[in-house]
Amino acid sequence: MTRMKQLLISISLLLLFVACSKEHDNNDGPLTKGRRTVIVYMSGRNTLSRFTNSDFQELVNGGSKIPSNDRLVVFLSRISDKEKQAIIRVTGDKKQPVDTLYKYQDSFYTSEPDNFVEVIKRTMTLCPADEYALVLWGHGSGWTVEKDTRRAYGIDNGNKESNYDMYGLWLNLPDMRKCFEELGVKWKYIFCDCCNMMGAEVAYELRNHA
């Protein structure tokens, strides 16, 4: 029953994209400046990939509550041979609930620091605003004293699902802090929809960036 439910959700979401989405040419310019852009960074090329569709659908369902001068933008990365990594705006419009702003032609590790920065910079360029907020979606191991690879977020196993404790590339929290320093943005807030990432140690590591 669970597999059937997941299949139905996947089919429904695919139909939603085909029937009710607008896809921009990657050369299209940015949107007009808004009040706030919330960026949801979904690092789903791991054991959480099966949940990306349903969680994204929840964002779409709540899109009608987004104020007209705010933007909710999702970077969606999941295990798929067909669906490319993309930056997608949730519009709140019933006729066109999602708007694909940019689709990457070549796959990449979302937890590589340079790629993390590039995605966020591109999203901020496409959806300029007076202020920005960030939601991190994916696996997290928080901040421990074991080794850097465990003070981390968003493991990426490439385009395959495997045991996230053994394989894949993490974005270490010290590296994430350096990414934020490079971006030079003071987030309105940083929300972590992942394990072990809402502790005081994580907040202290990122204290100067929100």
Predicted feature descriptions by range:
Residues 47-52, 82-84, 142-147, 197-202:
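Extracytoplasmic/secreted cell-surface and envelope-processing proteins
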Residues 21-130:
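N-terminal extension/subdomain marker
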Residues 14:
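Short, surface-exposed polybasic-aromatic patches that bind anionic ligands, especially phosphate groups
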Residues 17-19:
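C-terminal motif of bacterial Sec signal peptides marking the signal peptidase cleavage site
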Residues 75-104, 131, 135-170:
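Surface-exposed loop and adjacent secondary-structure segments within mature catalytic domains
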Residues 1-3:
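Short, Lys/Arg-enriched N-terminal segments with co-localized hydrophobic residues
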Residues 135-144, 151-210:
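Catalytic cores of nucleophile-dependent amide-cleaving enzymes
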Residues 5-11:
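Sec-dependent signal peptide recognition
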